[in-house]
Amino acid sequence: MQKVKLPLTLDPVRTAQKRLDYQGIYTPDQVERVAESVVSVDSDVECSMSFAIDNQRLAVLTGDAVVTVSLECQRCGKPFTHQVHTTYCFSPVRSDEQAEALPEAYEPIEVNEFGEIDLLATVEDEIILALPVVPVHDSEHCEVSEADMVFGELPDEAQKPNPFAVLASLKRK
């Protein structure tokens, strides 16, 4: 299958009325905000999107995105590869009142003054939200052993004298 670049912006209502489906990619160069959140973006962002009108006559965008990124393990500090897969379901709105009236199944997405949505920013947002809060290797792949991880009371050799103890004695005088 040929890799097709997706549009950056589009009119979601017109697209939903035509019931269009998109399958394509965003290149690593295009997803700058994702690149700022990870060590590196290792693959194209592969997206599939479907636009439709639901039973309540709302325009709906459903889809998913998959990308492979490198993250820094927070235990050992080494980079590791992680595949991010996210799904989404949006409905375009023009105001907060419309957003409040949406069914819970739909996330609101604001349209600009031309009635278009920023598709790239939407996909980037979903990928960033799907990234792990604390990225770590699986325990068997991490170079930090279970013995090196200390929980609760610190061993005696790890407890150092408080450097501010001198200040406490001066305060008493």
UniProtKB/Swiss-Prot annotation:
The keyword Lyase does not apply. Induction: Part of the yceD-rpmF operon, which may continue into downstream genes. Keywords: Ribosome biogenesis. GO terms for cellular component: cytosol. Pfam families: YceD. GO terms for biological process: ribosome biogenesis. It comes from the Bacteria. InterPro entries: YceD, YceD_bac. Plays a role in synthesis, processing and/or stability of 23S rRNA. Belongs to the DUF177 domain family. This is Large ribosomal RNA subunit accumulation protein YceD.
